């Protein structure tokens, strides 16, 4: 007993001694601060060398763009981690985004156990603890986040480590307010200068690689391809089922490319008939046709110097394909009704959900255009092939929906498990629609299994197609969810508890669905 107590005291004294030394050195670093970025990096070095806190990270919040950017990151072997300075978080996103949104410290005994852990840096040790604390600014509002990993997994030390980091965060926040905030605050927000962009240009916020959700091998590979292809003007063909996020990929490529400051213009090739396509893409001169009362630039001119995203390219006609091929080959075009040849410098990103090789074989798609577009193909996997991403996607989308609805939303683990049992024929778009519908139905703000409704009749979740009843042959797989519920109730003699057992659900779930699906219960 006495030996154990002495040992514990020694450890505590060692911790306090190291923390005092580290705090003293951090105070010296901050007192001599002249350059914010360099100063913050020095603070993280002290945390690593003197306080045994590895992978330190300091993020600062830009309230105008509503993003949390990495300002300093503990370097490995004195080398900057690739892409780390481009990674950003929104309030409520990931662990650091959660700390910013809540303004409270977050302590995890094992970082990988928390489903909010995004691991975008591919840096952290999954088995070690993780601590993130807010940098508090004026009026008790967070202006950033300090995060680090203790080098040892000693849970009894976590409270002391957290208090230490909170003290360091207070010192950092005070220095940042003195060095950075007065400059940006000198001008009222409403008077801040605005940079006018072309109307066709989409804001880059929300389209960086940091906003692509998914840690599956397939998504990691796609992110690597985007990083590589973004640097060049190579034509890209994005392929994937409807709802997989092809436009998001195109946006990410553009906004991470040297053309990011120019326009990103999108055009759906299936949205207009042939007689309007040419005018829409190439523009027209005044009087070129009835109703052409003025000259109008087409999408190619609007995208000059930037990127043109041609969605649903597989739906285009032979006539359209011929005109498109010419401009891809020569970089030249004329407006409808004009004779002046215009040169444009445009990067093309096309997208399709069709099997273009088969379309070429059938003569529906030009072979020469296919080879022009298919320089760098990117194939997006359907959501059913990356189920490990569903939980992260669900949390991401719930935060997005909560922001749009102006309220707090949460999703339960049970609801996540139910989502993972569904094969999502509509992919991410269907998942987002499902969660938005569930949020509307949830009065408490908790999205639980009870409020999740699927709308694809050919693809019921396993909870509605359990193996037991299916063996009896009573459940017709062609029925939609409402029809399945009625069939189960009829088989159970309209006893809700029995119907719930048949469907692998709880009686509460059955009762809720009866109400929202407007099923009339017979009087027994």
Curated annotation (Swiss-Prot):
Region (A domain): 1-182
Domain of life assignment: Bacteria
InterPro entries named among the record's database cross-references: AAA+_ATPase, GAF, GAF-like_dom_sf, Homeodomain-like_sf, HTH_Fis, Nif-specific_regulatory_prot, P-loop_NTPase, Sigma_54_int
Binding sites annotated in the UniProt record for ATP: 240-247, 303-312
Residue ranges of domain GAF in the record: 35-176
Family matches, as Gene3D superfamilies: 1.10.8.60, 3.30.450.40, Homeodomain-like, P-loop containing nucleotide triphosphate hydrolases
This protein's record includes keyword Iron: no
A GO MF label: DNA-binding transcription factor activity
Alphabetized PROSITE patterns for the sequence: SIGMA54_INTERACT_1, SIGMA54_INTERACT_2, SIGMA54_INTERACT_3, SIGMA54_INTERACT_4
UniProt keyword Transcription regulation present: yes
Functional note: Required for activation of most nif operons, which are directly involved in nitrogen fixation.
Protein name: Nif-specific regulatory protein
Gene that encodes the chain: nifA
């Amino acid at each position: 007993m006495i030996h154990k107590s002495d040992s514990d005291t020694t450890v505590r004294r060692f911790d306090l001694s190291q923390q005092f030394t580290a705090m003293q050195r951090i105070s010296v670093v901050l007192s001599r601060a002249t350059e914010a970025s360099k100063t913050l990096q020095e603070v993280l070095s002290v945390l690593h060398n003197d306080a045994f806190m590895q992978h330190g990270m300091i993020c600062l919040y830009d309230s105008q763009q509503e993003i949390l950017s990495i300002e300093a990151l503990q370097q490995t072997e004195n080398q900057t981690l690739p892409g780390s300075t481009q990674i950003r978080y929104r309030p409520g996103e990931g662990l650091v985004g959660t700390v910013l949104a809540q303004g409270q410290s977050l302590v995890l005994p094992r970082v990988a156990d928390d489903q909010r852990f995004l691991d975008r840096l591919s840096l952290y040790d999954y088995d070690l603890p993780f601590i993130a604390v807010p940098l508090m600014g004026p009026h008790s509002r967070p202006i950033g986040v300090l995060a680090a990993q203790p080098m040892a997994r000693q849970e009894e030390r976590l409270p002391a480590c957290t208090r230490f980091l909170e003290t360091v965060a207070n010192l950092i926040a005070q220095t940042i307010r003195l060095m950075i905030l007065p400059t940006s605050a000198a001008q009222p927000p409403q008077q801040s200068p605005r940079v006018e962009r072309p109307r066709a240009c989409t804001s880059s916020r929300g389209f960086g690689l940091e906003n692509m959700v998914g840690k599956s091998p397939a998504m990691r590979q796609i992110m690597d391809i985007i990083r590589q292809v973004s640097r060049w003007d190579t034509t890209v063909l994005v392929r994937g089922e409807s709802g997989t996020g092809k436009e998001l990929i195109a946006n990410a490529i553009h906004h991470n490319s040297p053309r990011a400051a120019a326009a990103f213009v999108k055009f759906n090739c299936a949205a207009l008939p042939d007689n309007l396509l040419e005018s829409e893409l190439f523009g027209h001169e005044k009087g070129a046709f009835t109703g052409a009362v003025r000259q109008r630039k087409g999408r190619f001119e609007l995208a000059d110097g930037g990127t043109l995203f041609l969605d649903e390219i597989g739906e285009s006609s032979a006539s359209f394909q011929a005109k498109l091929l010419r401009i891809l080959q020569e970089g030249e075009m004329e407006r409808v009704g004009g004779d002046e040849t215009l040169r444009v410098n445009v990067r093309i990103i096309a997208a399709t959900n069709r099997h273009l090789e088969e379309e070429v074989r059938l003569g529906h798609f030009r072979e020469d255009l296919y080879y022009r577009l298919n320089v760098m193909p990117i194939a997006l996997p359907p959501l059913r092939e990356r189920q490990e991403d569903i939980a992260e996607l669900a949390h991401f989308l719930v935060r997005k929906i909560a922001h749009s609805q102006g309220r707090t939303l949460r999703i339960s683990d049970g609801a996540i498990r139910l989502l993972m049992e569904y094969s999502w024929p509509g992919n991410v778009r269907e998942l987002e629609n499902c969660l938005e519908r569930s949020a509307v139905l949830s009065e408490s703000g908790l999205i639980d299994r009870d409020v999740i409704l699927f709308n694809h009749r050919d693809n019921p979740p396993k909870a509605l197609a359990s193996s037991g009843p299916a063996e009896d042959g009573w459940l017709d797989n062609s029925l939609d969810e409402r029809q399945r519920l009625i069939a189960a109730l009829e088989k159970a003699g309209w006893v809700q508890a029995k119907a719930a057992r048949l469907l692998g659900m709880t009686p509460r779930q059955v009762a809720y669905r009866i109400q929202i699906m407007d099923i009339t219960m017979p009087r027994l």
